[in-house]
A protein has these predicted regions:
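An N-terminal assembly and electron-transfer interface module characteristic of large anaerobic redox
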Residues: 1-186
Length: 186
């Protein structure tokens, strides 16, 4: 249903439905955040059109050696082998890397959710094949959510997953990173 612009009113200016929300806001995006994690390697499983921005950002950061992708082609959407594509693609990448990363940030996309892809099976299989690597489930899904965490917030939480839980020690402090530039007020 179309709503003329002059009839759009807050808080629901448009009919609720599938909406797109860019995963990158401004000049800081999920690629930049993933690169903050030392020893990590990012793997994106998506179509070439989705990878464009990721590739450009990795190139801009001169971090092409910490980034790989598995390309989803049109036939992959219909052949019923999406889980195998992800598992074998990621496995191939890890076998070919000169040095295996300690952490793999594996980014799936909206198409995996639309298809009902069994992400638990994918991660369980990869973790059993590569027990020395920590796999972090990350998402590049620009499908607007009306509730819950945004993709950006999910990634920020996911970056802490590789850290083991420690006993509380009141004589220690924790210093966490931030991508917000602190400016001198003077």
């Amino acid at each position: 249903e179309e709503i003329p612009f002059q009839d759009a009113a807050w808080p629901l200016p448009f009919v609720p439905g599938l909406e797109y929300n860019s995963p990158a806001h401004g000049t800081w995006n999920i690629v930049h955040m993933g690169m903050l994690l030392p020893g990590s390697h990012q793997i994106y499983v998506c179509g070439a059109n989705c990878n464009r921005g990721v590739i450009l950002t990795a190139s801009e950061m001169n971090a092409g050696d910490r980034f790989s992708f598995v390309e989803i082609k049109e036939e992959d959407l219909f052949n019923g082998q999406m889980e195998d594509l992800v598992i074998e693609g990621v496995s191939d990448i890890l076998h070919k890397l000169p040095k295996k990363p300690s952490v793999v940030l594996l980014f799936t996309v909206c198409v995996h959710h639309f298809m009902g892809c069994d992400l638990n099976y994918i991660y369980d299989t990869l973790r059993s094949r590569f027990p020395e690597q920590c796999f972090v489930d990350c998402y590049m899904d620009p499908i607007m959510q009306k509730e819950g965490l945004t993709p950006d917030q999910k990634l920020r939480n996911a970056l802490y997953k590789p850290l083991p839980m420690r006993e509380k020690n009141l004589k220690q402090i924790n210093i966490e990173f931030s991508n917000i530039i602190q400016r001198d007020k003077n």
